[in-house]
A protein has these predicted regions:
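Typically the conserved alpha-helix immediately C-terminal to a functionally engaged Cys/Sec
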Residues: 47-50, 54
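Residue-level detector of anion-binding/catalytic polar loops
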Residues: 57
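Stable alpha-helical elements in mature extracytoplasmic
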Residues: 40, 47, 64, 96-100
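Thiol/selenol-based redox catalytic cores and closely related redox-interacting motifs
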Residues: 71-155
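N-terminal secretory signal peptides and thylakoid transit peptides that target proteins
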Residues: 1-15
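Local sequence-structure signature of Cys/Sec-based thiol-disulfide redox active-site neighborhoods
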Residues: 31-46
Length: 155
């Protein structure tokens, strides 16, 4: 009888714990992307929303990205309006979340990924203001020697 009473009393506590633990575990599992951007840049904020909607947690620094880009080893010629760091890899510009997931899964020997400039149609540059316009662009794998190669093309 005492065992049954104990189980009846413990059941609500266990049920509550299971409903709160799952979302916390999911948040803990989301890869964290640390981002440096201009505080007034709207397309950067749209890229952050794109990452959040695709399984990433984000921490944003609105202090500009030039110093972060240099510190993380992204060549200036591959620069864009924001810089990120995830899993030891640098991200420069409007890199699609799909390619970031792929990068983390494949773990290539590289500095990270870059989408130079601000191509219309890339994540963060795809809002209503751009209509249906989609410019072709490449996601580049940035190598330690400063070189790069095409990681994924968007046409």
């Amino acid at each position: 009888m005492q065992r049954r009473t104990l189980l009846l009393r413990a059941a609500p506590v266990l049920a509550l714990a299971s409903t709160t633990a799952w979302p916390l575990a999911a948040l803990a599992a989301a890869p964290m992307v640390e981002i440096w951007k201009d505080p007034n840049c709207g397309c950067c904020q749209d890229w952050v929303k794109h990452l959040n909607a695709n399984g990433f947690a984000t921490r944003v620094h609105g202090s500009g990205n030039d110093a972060a880009r240099a510190r993380l080893g992204i060549p200036t010629k591959l620069g864009s309006c924001h810089t990120g760091l995830v899993g030891g890899y640098a991200l420069e510009g409007h890199v699609p979340a799909r390619e970031v997931h792929r990068l983390l899964r494949e773990k290539p020997k590289a500095v990270g990924l870059a989408v130079p400039g601000m191509p219309v149609g890339s994540p963060g540059m795809d809002g209503a203001a751009y209509g249906d316009r989609r410019d072709p662009y490449d996601v580049l794998l940035v190598l330690a020697d400063g070189g790069s190669r095409v990681y994924q093309s968007y046409r």
